[in-house]
């Protein structure tokens, strides 16, 4: 037994000695070099991937909706082909077709647009913050920014634009801005010198008559296209926000604190009417189809009266909707409202557009 163990130990001794001997051969050196290079190979591979491999998107690109919840739309006009155009935040002009299709037009500005008006099937104009004026001559396919707009060194927001036949337009705004164009918005000039008052709206009547309303209850009237002006008393100190006429004589102006003024002599004199509204009123329109006046304002407010502008009634488009509206546009039996949201009201039911 001892001899067997001894023989086994002798047989294993060379192998143990071989295993215990230090590995200093060429193969071992090659292995060490290869192992030491592994981290650098990994780092190099990551750098190459970062520089030269471009990740590919999976699935389609998510496009934001045309009308987003954060959008406000201050201007509203009947579109040439039916439906409406609205103008507002970030230079947006949006077409809402009679079939409900909603499309954003391409515009060359990010300035908020305050109003939009349409002459005919091809030509329209929009105005807004910092004196921006845009025009189109192809039905809204392309909008062009107009240069050379008269500017103030203080403030230049244009809040409203009204148009009339023959390419005439008047834009109102801060620092006494009353600007006129007679060539479909291509060029503009001042109707009055700059002053520290905001004119909020103007009505263009026949034969060169202009009636403008603004801050502090001020009213201006011209019968010669702006060559000379009269300032009839309004009897109120609240800022007047909008004015409209249904013919050469009968007009209505509305303003803050529910103010409603009525004129029956082309704006030469004004009388206050009891509107029944407590909220601010921002717009007034004559609804020819329904032979009524219709106004819009804060907290979803509306006011209305018959053609004689007497017996005013007030209410809200929806008790659950407290959005303010700066524009109202009669449309058949219904009316469009635009402001903090856009919606259609039939006198009973309010339907806000998706996204608002």
Predicted regions and their residues:
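Residue-level hotspots at or immediately adjacent to binding/recognition sites across diverse folds
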Residues: 2-356
């Amino acid at each position: 037994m001892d001899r067997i163990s001894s023989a086994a130990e002798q047989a294993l001794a060379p192998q143990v000695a071989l295993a215990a001997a230090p590995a200093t051969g060429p193969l071992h050196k090659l292995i060490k070099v290869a192992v030491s290079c592994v981290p650098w190979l990994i780092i190099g591979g990551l750098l190459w991937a970062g520089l030269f491999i471009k990740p590919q998107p999976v699935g389609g690109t998510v496009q934001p909706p045309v009308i987003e919840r954060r959008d406000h739309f201050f201007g509203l006009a009947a579109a040439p082909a039916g439906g409406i155009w609205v103008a507002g935040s970030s230079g947006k002009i949006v077409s809402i077709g009679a079939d409900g299709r909603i499309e954003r037009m391409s515009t060359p500005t990010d300035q908020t647009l305050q109003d939009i008006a349409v002459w005919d099937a091809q030509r329209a104009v929009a105005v807004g913050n910092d004196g921006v004026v845009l025009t189109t001559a192809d039905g809204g396919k392309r909008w062009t920014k107009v240069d050379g707009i008269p500017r103030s060194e203080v403030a230049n927001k244009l809040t409203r634009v009204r148009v009339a036949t023959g390419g005439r337009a008047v834009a109102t705004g801060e620092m006494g801005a009353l600007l006129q164009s007679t060539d479909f918005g291509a060029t503009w000039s001042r109707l009055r010198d700059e002053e520290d008052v905001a004119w909020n709206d103007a009505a263009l009547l026949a034969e060169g008559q202009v009636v403008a309303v603004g801050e502090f209850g001020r009213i201006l009237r011209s019968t010669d296209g702006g060559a000379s002006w009269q300032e009839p008393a309004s009897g109120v100190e609240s800022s007047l926000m909008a004015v409209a006429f249904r013919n050469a004589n009968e007009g209505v102006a509305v303003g803050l604190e529910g103010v409603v003024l009525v004129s029956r002599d082309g704006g030469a004199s004004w009388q206050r009417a009891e509107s029944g509204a407590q909220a601010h009123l921002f717009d007034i329109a004559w609804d020819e189809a329904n032979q009524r006046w219709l106004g819009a304002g804060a907290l979803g407010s509306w006011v209305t009266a018959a053609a004689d502008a007497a017996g005013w009634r007030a209410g809200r488009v929806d008790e659950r909707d407290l959005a303010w509206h700066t524009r109202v546009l009669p449309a058949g039996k219904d009316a469009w409202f635009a402001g903090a949201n856009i919606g259609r009201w039939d006198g009973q039911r309010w339907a806000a557009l998706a996204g608002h």
